[in-house]
Amino acid sequence: MVERARRLGRWFLALDSLLVILGFFVVMPMISLRFVDQLGWAAGVVGLALGLRQLTQQGLGILGGSLADKFGARPLIVGGMLLRAAGFASLAYAQSGLELILSCVISGLGGCLFDPPRAALVIKFTRPRQRGRYISLLMMLESAGAVVGALLGSWLLNFDFEYVCLLGAGLFVCAALCNLLILPAYKLSVRPTPIRAGLGQVLADKAFCRLVLILSGYYALWVQVMLIFPILVKQMAGTTTAVGWMYTLETAISLALLYPLARYGERHFKLESRLMAGVLLMTTGIGLVAFANTLPAVFMLLACFYLGIVIAEPARETLMTKLAQPGARGSYMGFSRLGLALGGMTGYVGGGALHDYAMLQGQPWLPWLVLGTVGVTTLLLLVNCFHREPSLARVNI
């Protein structure tokens, strides 16, 4: 692929990511506020719906990646985005737990189709040495989109949840049209790969599979910014606008620190060291919320948590792209989402159930201490994994 095509591809992916992240954050943080805070549903039910979306999207990601290896990126991306739009639109009319779950699963099915090929296009459009920096820039752009989306969603929620869902759906329709009209019919792998062969190649890579499964603990922490963090902030502040402040804080940290920290980390630290340092900060931030009694204290700990994500996520994504084999890129990037599937499902369902139990027992600190324990366990498993599998460290060379 000539350099001009790579450069244009990177620009297109950046703009596409902005539309996708706007559509996602307009809707997703508002679901727990709408159904738990406004309608009084059990957080466990809402957590189950969100967890099933996560499990569907990421758990079937390897299938979406394998299909993309065989048929190319564009049909999977366009179809997946339209399916996500349908799921978001149907959320507006969900009147029962079953309807909420169905809407979330439809949304997740869309994501399992478009997410792996988009991740594989990052590999196609970047050279190895520039990949980490490009991923960091994408994350900065996505952070800005997240805060704009969350602010729009929280503002529209004051009027009608239907407006929230239809705006999110409309943004995904726009993204689908852009991909249909602009994105060339790229193949993702160096050669067309049969679905079974791609899956087999990934599953034979035991070190990669082990790392992906361990990272489910990282994601169990990460998804709380969609579930119990918004509930806590809304309860302490007394206004849904405060949820937008959460994402403003995340964006400020990302824009100020993500790229310089990624560049500094590339020069001075290995990928696994950066990943583990980020998990440590996330664990500290989420665990100490158990002892925070004021909104400023919660936001200070959120800042620590977000800083951990800023350090860990570029390293994690770069590590996954470097471990992906050229003959099955889509399959590798699809399987890499399995940790998010398992961790997201566990985090959503467990976080929601813990929140309900803690409120009933008058123990609001309980979910945060349990999540802190999950973070410590994940960190110890990562240390052991990188020690046992030196092949995972050699990708830094």
Curated annotation (Swiss-Prot):
Name the CDD domains on file. Answer: MFS_MdtH_MDR_like
Q: Which domain of life is it from?
A: Bacteria
Topology of this chain in the membrane: Multi-pass membrane protein
Q: Transmembrane ranges? A: 11-31, 32-52, 71-91, 94-114, 137-157, 163-183, 211-231, 242-262, 291-311, 340-360, 366-386
Task: Give me the Gene Ontology terms describing cellular component.
Answer: plasma membrane
Q: Where in the cell is it found?
A: Cell inner membrane
* Gene3D superfamilies assigned to the protein according to its UniProt record, in alphabetical order: MFS general substrate transporter like domains
Keywords, sorted A to Z: Cell inner membrane, Cell membrane, Membrane, Transmembrane, Transmembrane helix, Transport
Q: Which GO terms describe its molecular function?
A: transmembrane transporter activity
Q: What is its main location?
A: membrane
> InterPro entries recorded for this chain?
MFS, MFS_dom, MFS_trans_sf, MFS_Transporters, Multidrug-R_MdtH
HAMAP family registered for this protein in UniProt: MFS_MdtH
Looking up PANTHER family in the UniProt record yields: MULTIDRUG RESISTANCE PROTEIN MDTH, RESISTANCE PROTEIN MDTM, PUTATIVE-RELATED-RELATED
Q: Which family does it belong to?
A: Belongs to the major facilitator superfamily. DHA1 family. MdtH (TC 2.A.1.2.21) subfamily.
Please give the name of this protein.
Multidrug resistance protein MdtH
Please name the source species.
Answer: Aeromonas hydrophila subsp. hydrophila (strain ATCC 7966 / DSM 30187 / BCRC 13018 / CCUG 14551 / JCM 1027 / KCTC 2358 / NCIMB 9240 / NCTC 8049)
